[in-house]
Amino acid sequence: MQSLITYIALVFSLFVSSAIGLHLEVPALPNPQPVCIRDFVQENQMVVVNIKTDGSKGDGQRLDLKVTDSLGNEYRNKKDVVGHANVAFTSQHNAAIDICLTNYLDNKWSKHQQTVRSVELDIESGAAARDWNALQASEKLKPVEVELKRIESITEEIVEELRYLKAREERMRDTNESTNSRVKWFSIVVIASLVGFGVWQIQYLRHYFKVKHII
């Protein structure tokens, strides 16, 4: 039974909960450009970013971490990340989040060979970001009960995701219908204008020819 529940939870996790593991080499430059990772999260969804870097303070590099979303909200801005760092926040909107790393090179090191920071980045969101071991310990739950709660959490996220997709589809459909209606009426106006202009031109030419006694 427990193995079945675990299997179901893993299947659900493929659809909703996301856990991204990346290895990055971030070059250090005097005027660096940020290296960003983008992921989409739902509103009120918990996100945990785990960072592990090499290097040390005073090695001529300063690695900064900044987390924002596509709507301009800033969640975290951490300076001089060294070793292990953990950032957790709750998203405010259904939006894409950008996790950006910027590696600054100290001026006195600028004449040396190019240096980089090796970064291991883990991004977890939704049910994958929750500490289920802590929940099990605090509520004294059995492993099966923890898996059931995890499945319940994942199921709720699936429902919210489907609601969001449905609402988005309805908005896009309304936009398409409105656009089609405007194009239809614009086409009718253009055709009516062309017909009216053609009739006026025919009448004008008939009058012109009559004046000139051509017809």
UniProtKB/Swiss-Prot annotation:
Residues 34-125 form the GOLD domain. Residues 206-215 are cytoplasmic. One of its GO terms (cellular component) is endoplasmic reticulum-Golgi intermediate compartment. It comes from the Eukaryota. Residues 1-21 form the signal peptide. It is found in: Endoplasmic reticulum membrane; Golgi apparatus membrane. GO terms for biological process: endoplasmic reticulum to Golgi vesicle-mediated transport; Golgi organization; intracellular protein transport. Coiled coil: none annotated. Residues 22-184 are lumenal. Pfam families: EMP24_GP25L. The chain crosses the membrane at residues 185-205. PROSITE patterns: GOLD. Belongs to the EMP24/GP25L family. Constituent of COPII-coated endoplasmic reticulum-derived transport vesicles. Required for efficient transport of a subset of secretory proteins to the Golgi. Facilitates retrograde transport from the Golgi to the endoplasmic reticulum. PANTHER family: TRANSMEMBRANE EMP24 DOMAIN-CONTAINING PROTEIN. This is Endoplasmic reticulum vesicle protein 25. It comes from Candida albicans (strain SC5314 / ATCC MYA-2876). The gene is ERV25.
